[in-house]
Design a protein with these regions (language model features):
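N-terminal hydrophobic/helix-forming segments and targeting peptides
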Residues: 1-372
């Protein structure tokens, strides 16, 4: 019998994690999953993720680095510090017992995800319908965004500098939005195209209204009605879109997936599953030997460019400030600290899918519940 064969002392054993979990382990697994589902349901933009992490970190005793710099407060082993950049990138530190130049232990992940962004002047009317003009951010399958309930998340900065947080489409009483598609009876030509060409990026316009304002003398009555609704609720005018950053994301909560609740369906798991678990791990660290860091950044989906991506000098500048508050700043200290550090830069991979076995090599693929 196969089961009676002697196990090799040299070969790798592929065990299923579920077989190894104790009842206590299983309880912890599903409690973590529930916390993660709640996080993924509420935090659908990089700004929302960073705000959540900052709030939790402050409750856990982390201090804002900028406040410490202004107070010229020295850092010692065990101190907890965070630095934030433009509300879209955050780094958390627990100061170690050993000198910073001995290196740091770093976890890294990104908190941005593929999505649709509103353009600077997005609202327009066409044939009695109000729409929002968008462009896509990151790598998306354009056809997946058709006829899906969508929500708007973001911030608007008004002319007087007031910042307004916007979330529409998540509460039960909220409307949702969507990108329209063709009826199957009208899609003969569309169906002949490849998946990549069947939906053009320029057609990913979000339908947001169809009722005209009660004034027959004005032009673009449906658009004007949408502007009135936004003004009544948020006090904004059309010009405020120019200084807004509004993201279009799938509406609705993350959910357990499968009869056995063994999987999770959520928008943005690339790479927030790594960001969330890195943050959870960071919250358990107290007085390490080496300084520990969790670095959660923006802009990975478009090449890590820009002020809040890893092409910026945010991390190096933050390490320099940390070294200064530890009382041992020098260019050489920073260089040694970075050179001697070790980092796990985590991102997601696809598990082997029996529906598409041709795109993966089983011997090198990851499997649900088993890893690689």
């Amino acid at each position: 019998m196969e089961d009676n064969k002697k196990k090799s002392p040299f070969a790798k054993e592929y065990e299923i994690a579920w077989d190894k979990y104790s009842q206590k382990d299983l309880k912890n697994v599903f409690e973590l999953a529930d916390r993660y589902i709640d996080f993924m349901s509420r935090c659908k933009t990089e700004r929302e993720c960073v705000e959540e992490f900052r709030n939790r970190a402050e409750k856990a005793g982390y201090k804002n680095l900028q406040d410490l710099i202004e107070a010229n407060k020295k850092l010692k082993a065990g101190d907890k510090v965070y630095a934030e950049l433009m509300g879209k990138t955050i780094a958390l530190f627990v100061i170690g017992k050993r000198p910073l130049e001995d290196g740091m232990l770093i976890l890294g992940a990104h908190v941005d995800s593929p999505r649709l962004d509103l353009k600077q002047n997005p609202l327009y009317e066409d044939t009695g319908l109000a729409l929002l003009d968008t462009h896509y951010y990151g790598g998306i399958k354009k056809y997946q965004w058709m006829t899906m309930p969508l929500a708007l998340h973001g911030v608007i900065v008004k002319k007087d500098g007031t910042k307004i947080n916007v979330v529409i489409g998540e509460d039960d009483g909220d409307p949702v939005f969507g990108v329209s598609d063709l009826l199957i009876h009208l899609a003969k030509d569309q169906m002949k195209k490849s998946l990549a060409e069947g939906v053009e990026g320029e057609k990913l316009n979000v339908l947001v209204g169809s009722i005209p304002i009660n004034d027959k003398k004005v032009k673009n009555r449906v658009k004007q009605n949408i502007l009135k609704i936004l003004n009544d609720k948020y006090g904004i005018v059309e010009e405020d879109f120019v200084s807004a950053e509004i993201e279009v994301v799938p509406a609705g909560r993350a959910r357990h997936y499968g009869f056995d609740n063994s999987m999770i369906m959520a928008y943005g798991q690339d790479d927030r599953v790594c960001a969330y678990t890195s943050f959870e791990a960071m919250m358990e660290i107290e007085k390490p030997e080496k300084t520990c860091v969790t670095l959660l950044v923006d802009k990975e989906e478009i090449g890590s460019v820009g002020a809040t991506g890893m092409h910026s000098r945010f991390f190096e500048n933050t390490v320099a400030e940390i070294a200064n508050l530890m009382g041992n700043y020098s260019e050489l200290t920073i260089r040694r600290a970075l050179a001697n550090s070790k980092m796990i830069s985590s991102d997601v991979s696809a598990a082997f899918d029996p529906n598409y076995p041709e795109v993966m090599e089983k011997q090198s693929a990851a499997f649900f519940g088993k890893g690689i």
